[in-house]
């Protein structure tokens, strides 16, 4: 990036540090099937995804399958972005692997239905990206990963999963057990802490809980992860318990205090 752009980020980091604060920068390899299909009009290019998935906004519009070569380039770019963030004095990087964006599309069998190539292994893209970032930033630089424990599409739609054309291919999403296994491997690859949510674009209301849902509605989700790591004795790369961040209507100090004291999250 241009020197002027880098200096802007460095100035922002120093301003935050002046108040005793720390901040992470969120990195994403892209939107994939949930990106607006303006690329077709503006660049005469089809949108892309892990497999031949339908575009979220225009289901009749197919997304082209990214080649292994292009995915490897994306991983290298993520490593460079993380190295740039460290050079700008930003305190850590935060990978967005939730809500059905491209990182989730590559690491969830609902969207990644590849049969050939190294990224037919649905865990590999995410693990390779974390390893590349860790290689570029060194051992003492935090990597945070935002993930959903489940897409919860089958729970949301039930029998409609077989009836709605735009949902049919997404029935075999990552199970909770598979997600926990993936998270274990992410820790081994270099992730230091997690932000755990639930849902995706195709059940948009769920990861953005409406007024009718109670405060702290997803604390059981973060507790599942906390208990799993504790039971298996999984420690972060810093040798401490893996911190787990909770989400879901936590704008209430009393609810947050109980959650922290009760061990639901960190």
Predicted stretch roles:
Residues 1-266:
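Flavin-dependent oxidoreductase catalytic cores
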């Amino acid at each position: 990036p241009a020197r002027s752009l880098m200096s802007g980020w460095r100035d922002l980091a120093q301003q935050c540090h002046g108040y005793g604060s720390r901040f992470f920068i969120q990195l994403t390899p892209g939107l994939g099937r949930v990106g607006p299909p303006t690329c077709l009009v503006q660049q005469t290019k089809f949108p892309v995804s892990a497999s031949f998935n339908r575009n979220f906004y225009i289901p009749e519009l197919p997304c082209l399958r990214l080649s292994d070569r292009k995915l490897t380039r994306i991983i290298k770019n993520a490593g460079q972005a993380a190295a740039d963030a460290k050079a700008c004095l930003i305190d850590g990087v935060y990978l967005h692997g939730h809500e059905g964006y491209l990182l989730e599309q590559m690491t969830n069998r609902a969207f990644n239905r590849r049969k050939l190539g190294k990224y037919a292994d649905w865990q590999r893209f995410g693990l390779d990206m974390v390893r590349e970032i860790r290689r570029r930033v060194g051992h003492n630089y935090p990597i945070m990963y935002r993930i959903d424990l489940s897409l919860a599409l089958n729970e949301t739609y039930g029998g409609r999963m077989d009836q709605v054309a735009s949902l049919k291919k997404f029935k075999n999403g990552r199970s909770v057990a598979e997600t926990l296994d993936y998270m274990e491997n992410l820790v081994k690859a270099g992730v230091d802490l997690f932000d755990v949510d639930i849902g995706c674009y195709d059940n948009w209301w769920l990861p953005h809980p409406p007024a009718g849902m109670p405060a702290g509605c997803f604390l059981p989700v973060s507790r599942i992860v906390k208990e799993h790591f504790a039971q298996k004795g999984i420690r972060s790369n810093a040798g401490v318990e893996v911190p787990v961040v909770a989400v879901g209507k936590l704008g209430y100090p009393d609810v947050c205090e109980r959650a922290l004291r009760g061990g639901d999250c960190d």
